A protein has these predicted regions:
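Glycine-rich N-terminal segment of FAD-binding domains in flavoprotein oxidoreductases
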Residues: 65-92
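N-terminal glycine-/serine-/threonine-rich phosphate-binding loop
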Residues: 2-70
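Short, glycine/acidic-enriched capping/hinge loops at junctions between secondary-structure elements
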Residues: 51, 82-85, 113-115
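Short, well-ordered amphipathic alpha-helices
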Residues: 55-59, 81-91, 124-127
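Acidic/polar N-terminal loop/beta-strand segments that form early-domain functional surfaces
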Residues: 41-43, 74-76, 105
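Ligand-binding beta-strand-loop-alpha-helix segment within the catalytic cores
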Residues: 19-35, 95-139
Length: 139
Protein backbone atom coordinates (compact mmCIF):
# COMPACT_ATOMS: atom_id res chain seq x y z
CA UNK A 1 0.00 0.00 0.00
CA UNK A 2 1.35 3.41 -0.94
CA UNK A 3 1.35 5.83 1.95
CA UNK A 4 2.88 9.01 0.54
CA UNK A 5 0.23 9.91 -2.01
CA UNK A 6 0.02 13.62 -1.18
CA UNK A 7 3.22 14.30 -3.11
CA UNK A 8 1.58 12.78 -6.21
CA UNK A 9 -1.65 14.78 -6.08
CA UNK A 10 -1.69 17.58 -8.64
CA UNK A 11 -4.59 19.56 -10.06
CA UNK A 12 -3.87 18.34 -13.59
CA UNK A 13 -4.77 14.83 -12.45
CA UNK A 14 -7.79 15.79 -10.38
CA UNK A 15 -11.02 16.40 -12.24
CA UNK A 16 -12.04 20.08 -12.11
CA UNK A 17 -15.46 19.04 -10.80
CA UNK A 18 -13.77 18.37 -7.44
CA UNK A 19 -12.26 21.83 -7.08
CA UNK A 20 -14.38 23.99 -9.38
CA UNK A 21 -18.05 22.99 -9.04
CA UNK A 22 -20.37 24.11 -11.83
CA UNK A 23 -23.27 25.26 -9.67
CA UNK A 24 -24.38 25.96 -6.10
CA UNK A 25 -25.72 22.45 -5.58
CA UNK A 26 -22.43 20.79 -6.53
CA UNK A 27 -20.57 23.27 -4.31
CA UNK A 28 -22.82 22.46 -1.35
CA UNK A 29 -22.23 18.73 -1.84
CA UNK A 30 -18.45 19.23 -1.88
CA UNK A 31 -18.33 21.64 1.07
CA UNK A 32 -21.07 20.39 3.38
CA UNK A 33 -18.58 19.26 6.03
CA UNK A 34 -16.26 22.27 5.83
CA UNK A 35 -16.18 24.69 8.75
CA UNK A 36 -14.41 27.41 6.73
CA UNK A 37 -15.42 28.17 3.13
CA UNK A 38 -12.54 27.11 0.89
CA UNK A 39 -11.85 27.80 -2.77
CA UNK A 40 -9.14 26.02 -4.74
CA UNK A 41 -7.48 27.64 -7.75
CA UNK A 42 -5.24 26.18 -10.42
CA UNK A 43 -2.38 28.58 -9.64
CA UNK A 44 -1.26 30.84 -6.79
CA UNK A 45 -1.65 33.85 -9.09
CA UNK A 46 -5.28 33.00 -9.88
CA UNK A 47 -6.05 32.64 -6.17
CA UNK A 48 -4.22 35.87 -5.30
CA UNK A 49 -6.12 37.78 -7.98
CA UNK A 50 -9.46 36.57 -6.62
CA UNK A 51 -8.50 37.54 -3.07
CA UNK A 52 -7.40 40.98 -4.31
CA UNK A 53 -10.71 41.39 -6.18
CA UNK A 54 -12.62 40.52 -2.99
CA UNK A 55 -10.60 43.04 -0.95
CA UNK A 56 -11.03 45.72 -3.63
CA UNK A 57 -14.79 45.17 -3.68
CA UNK A 58 -14.95 45.49 0.11
CA UNK A 59 -12.94 48.75 -0.04
CA UNK A 60 -15.26 50.15 -2.73
CA UNK A 61 -18.40 49.11 -0.83
CA UNK A 62 -17.17 50.89 2.30
CA UNK A 63 -16.26 53.99 0.24
CA UNK A 64 -19.79 54.14 -1.18
CA UNK A 65 -21.19 53.91 2.35
CA UNK A 66 -18.80 56.64 3.58
CA UNK A 67 -17.14 54.28 6.06
CA UNK A 68 -13.64 53.06 6.78
CA UNK A 69 -12.55 49.64 5.56
CA UNK A 70 -10.53 47.96 8.30
CA UNK A 71 -8.01 45.31 7.24
CA UNK A 72 -5.59 43.17 9.24
CA UNK A 73 -2.72 42.41 6.87
CA UNK A 74 0.29 40.14 7.18
CA UNK A 75 3.87 40.80 6.18
CA UNK A 76 6.15 38.14 4.77
CA UNK A 77 6.13 36.45 1.38
CA UNK A 78 2.79 34.61 1.47
CA UNK A 79 0.57 37.60 0.56
CA UNK A 80 3.03 39.09 -1.97
CA UNK A 81 0.90 38.21 -5.03
CA UNK A 82 -2.24 39.62 -3.39
CA UNK A 83 -0.49 42.91 -2.61
CA UNK A 84 0.94 43.10 -6.15
CA UNK A 85 -2.57 42.72 -7.56
CA UNK A 86 -3.90 45.45 -5.22
CA UNK A 87 -1.10 47.83 -6.25
CA UNK A 88 -1.90 47.11 -9.90
CA UNK A 89 -5.60 47.86 -9.27
CA UNK A 90 -4.63 51.12 -7.55
CA UNK A 91 -2.44 52.23 -10.46
CA UNK A 92 -4.52 50.93 -13.38
CA UNK A 93 -8.09 51.06 -12.08
CA UNK A 94 -7.90 53.93 -9.61
CA UNK A 95 -8.62 51.85 -6.51
CA UNK A 96 -8.23 54.30 -3.62
CA UNK A 97 -7.01 53.33 -0.17
CA UNK A 98 -7.91 56.68 1.46
CA UNK A 99 -10.67 55.06 3.52
CA UNK A 100 -8.59 52.02 4.56
CA UNK A 101 -7.31 51.38 8.07
CA UNK A 102 -4.60 48.71 8.30
CA UNK A 103 -3.55 46.72 11.32
CA UNK A 104 -0.29 44.81 11.00
CA UNK A 105 -1.29 41.26 11.83
CA UNK A 106 1.91 40.35 13.67
CA UNK A 107 5.34 41.66 14.47
CA UNK A 108 8.52 40.29 15.95
CA UNK A 109 9.30 41.64 19.42
CA UNK A 110 11.41 43.65 20.21
CA UNK A 111 12.18 44.31 16.53
CA UNK A 112 11.91 47.95 15.43
CA UNK A 113 9.31 48.66 12.74
CA UNK A 114 12.05 49.68 10.28
CA UNK A 115 14.27 46.63 10.89
CA UNK A 116 15.14 44.38 7.95
CA UNK A 117 12.94 41.48 9.09
CA UNK A 118 10.03 43.61 10.28
CA UNK A 119 6.60 42.55 9.01
CA UNK A 120 5.50 46.18 8.93
CA UNK A 121 8.51 47.09 6.78
CA UNK A 122 7.72 44.33 4.29
CA UNK A 123 4.05 45.37 4.28
CA UNK A 124 5.11 48.93 3.46
CA UNK A 125 7.49 47.79 0.72
CA UNK A 126 4.95 45.46 -0.91
CA UNK A 127 1.77 47.55 -0.57
CA UNK A 128 1.53 50.63 1.60
CA UNK A 129 4.29 52.68 -0.08
CA UNK A 130 2.61 52.16 -3.47
CA UNK A 131 -0.96 53.24 -2.68
CA UNK A 132 -2.66 56.41 -1.42
CA UNK A 133 -3.25 55.23 2.15
CA UNK A 134 -2.97 57.77 4.97
CA UNK A 135 -0.09 56.44 7.08
CA UNK A 136 -1.91 57.67 10.20
CA UNK A 137 -4.35 54.84 9.47
CA UNK A 138 -1.63 52.16 9.73
CA UNK A 139 -1.18 50.47 13.10
Amino acid sequence: MKTNLSSQITLNRVSPRYFRPENAFERSVLTRLEKIPTDIYESPEEGANQIALDIAQMIRDKQKAGRFCVLALAGGNSPRNVYSALVRMHKEEGLSFRNVVVFNLSEYYPLASDAVNSNLKSLKEMLLDHVDIDMQNVF
